[in-house]
A protein has these predicted regions:
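Active-site neighborhoods and metal-handling regions in enzymes and metal-associated proteins
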Residues: 1-599
């Protein structure tokens, strides 16, 4: 059977479902490690549905199929599934069923839902079980993705694994393991299964390039009071890394042996295994081992790496300065070539950015695929230009550029919206309101008991005044030499984490009008202590990224005096920090971009 198109692949999937006795099949966006960005080998949802996006689920029944996507991807998903049978389920919108509700409604008593236990989180399976029990339906684990996607499928990643030196990380793997064991003791646990790649990378200072734009190695770690076992393809561990791991009392075992090894554990342990991030196949093995008592709970590594240590912060500040210099040189070249009448496209933007960032001797990789979106394309929050589908830049309107890089000493994420020529009054209004939102968050002060979801509203309020909102979070945490998105904190309407000094978060409000315009202004901020007094502990933010923010689109009379003062002070800092790294011509350009504005 040919499987070159989405309809052909769905037909093959339904045939396999019938042969295996399942009435519904669920394909989540995921790999065995609950990764946000996936190795190409695990992009099964894309292969079956045609949708390229994060945080989504795809469900196929005997007669229909449905795709769940969040607000960042509504526009993109509609375009990518157009012409197929697939129905878009807009997550969080009124009247839209959850995946669990949809699956339960699609099943009759005695029928089964199929899914792959390696790529489904335990939390997802537990939620499905609760919903299906009411219908008398069950879950059957099987791997139809591997059965059907055989031709042209990328191999499992296998890049060299290396150790990030302590001079950058701040602590050795052995020191971090001791910290983790102390945390586990506080939680009433003696062991932990670490499946999430960002947590494992931080814990062991382990890095590789297994996932595009993400310097992680596909691996697991099992930690007890006396042992730490790293499950990884040992052949890909560099001799230097192997020696460093062994010197830190870390034992190496083969990646494919993880289930067998956990099943063979005889030492009694109370094992912390976070249901949200440990895959169902692993969790089942842990639960079925009589020597192990499994405990669900929040992974303490989330907070341990979420609060950057002094060494990490010192290095990441330096990385952001160098990244800002690259951004300045990018903008100078972009403006010069446009002024000279060259034909530039969204793809050209990516090429110029890469040229300047990759010239840094500590550059490793872009931290995500550059989003260079001109005009209406920017209304799609995660738009990506391709050789087949991209826009030519014109001398009018806005160009949104969301980009970043990972260096040996830090990971960056920045968005600027550049005016390329005349703007409409609506474009100016949207830009000014977005900047107002950005500034209000950047200069915010709050008591330390405030949760992230409360701080999120500070950025939204200036847009809410005009009955505008954005269907995404205001900000996310950024790893140190790792994933551009991490936990535990994020500025959105749901996150209950309390910000702590040393936490890094983005500040990126925006306005998105479908097919018309997209505007976003983003800096990374670090949470800092402001004061202690009779009212409590006050916290605030300081910027990590110092790149000029366009002032020409700002409408007069909208920003208040405090917002203008913040912007002028920010630009004073930009010039002071970047000027020493620039030549005379670049400094002159920067001085113009950083000129103070009035009321």
């Amino acid at each position: 059977m040919s499987m070159n198109t989405v309809p052909e692949r769905l037909a093959a999937l339904r045939a396999a479902m019938a042969a295996n006795g399942v009435a519904v099949y669920l394909i989540p966006v995921g790999d065995p490690h609950a990764s946000e960005y996936l190795p190409c080998h695990y992009t099964s949802l894309t292969w079956f549905s045609g949708f390229h996006g994060e945080n989504s689920n795809f469900v196929v029944t005997r007669t229909e199929s449905a795709l769940w996507a969040d607000g960042r991807y509504f526009v993109q998903a509609e375009k990518e599934i157009a012409g197929t049978e697939i129905k878009l389920q807009r997550m969080g919108e009124p009247g839209v069923p959850t995946v669990e509700e949809y699956c339960a409604n699609a099943l009759n008593e005695g029928e089964a839902l199929g899914l792959c236990g390696l790529t489904a989180s335990t939390a997802l399976v537990n939620d499905l079980k609760k919903a299906l029990e009411k219908k008398g339906a069950s879950i059957k684990t099987l791997n139809l993705e591997d059965e059907l996607w055989t031709e042209g499928r990328p191999a499992l990643p296998d890049t060299p694994a290396w150790i990030l030196p302590k001079e950058y990380a701040g602590f050795s793997p052995a020191e971090k393991l001791d910290q983790l064991r102390s945390k586990l003791k506080e939680l009433g646990c003696t062991a932990q299964f670490v499946g999430k790649l960002d947590n494992l990378a931080w814990l062991l200072n382990l890095r590789a390039m297994d996932i595009e734009c993400t310097p992680y190695a596909m691996a697991y770690c099992y930690v007890t009071p006396s042992r730490a076992v790293l499950f990884i393809n040992t052949a890909r561990v560099t001799p230097e890394a192997k020696a460093e791991l062994e010197a830190n009392d870390i034992t190496l075992a083969e990646y494919d042996d993880v289930l067998k090894s956990l099943a063979a554990e005889t030492e009694p342990q109370t094992v912390l295994a976070e249901c949200a991030t440990v895959n169902y196949a692993v969790y089942q093995v842990l639960e079925q081992n009589p020597a192990l008592t499994v405990k669900d709970g929040t992974d303490p590594l989330l907070m341990m790496k979420g609060v950057k240590n002094e060494t990490e912060l010192a290095h990441t500040k330096q990385a952001h300065i160098r990244d800002a210099v690259a951004m300045v040189r990018f903008q100078i070249e972009l403006e010069s070539r446009l002024a000279a009448g060259e034909t530039l496209t969204e793809l050209t933007v990516d090429e110029i950015l890469h040229k300047y960032r990759s010239a840094d001797d500590k550059f490793l990789v872009e931290s995500f695929g550059t989003i260079a979106a001109y005009g209406g394309n920017a209304a799609m929050m995660h738009y990506h230009a391709t050789p087949e589908d991209h826009a030519v830049l014109e001398k009018k309107g806005f160009l949104l550029v969301d980009s970043g890089a990972t260096y040996m000493d830090g990971t960056t994420d920045i968005t600027r919206t550049y005016p390329l020529g005349p703007l409409t009054e609506d474009e100016k209004r949207f830009y000014t309101w977005t900047l107002q939102s950005h500034i209000d968050l950047a200069k915010a002060v709050w008591l330390d008991y405030c949760e992230c979801k409360m701080i999120d509203t500070i950025a939204r309020e200036p847009l809410w005044r005009h009955l505008i909102n954005y269907r995404c979070g205001t900000g996310h945490s950024v790893s140190f030499v790792g994933n551009v998105h991490e936990g535990p904190h994020a500025l959105n309407s749901r996150n209950t984490t309390r910000m702590r000094p040393g936490m890094v978060v983005t500040d990126e409000p925006g306005v998105y009008e479908t097919d018309l315009v997209g505007i976003r202004i983003e800096n990374e901020l670090v949470c800092v202590h402001r004061a202690d007094n009779q009212y409590g502990t006050f916290l605030g933010f300081e910027p990590l990224m110092f790149v000029p923010i366009a002032t020409s689109p700002i409408l007069p009379g909208v920003l208040d005096k405090d917002e203008i003062a913040w912007l002028n002070d920010y630009h004073r800092q930009v010039f002071a920090k970047l000027a020493p790294h620039l030549n005379d011509e670049e400094r002159s350009w920067l001085a113009e971009k950083c000129a103070a504005i009035g009321c």
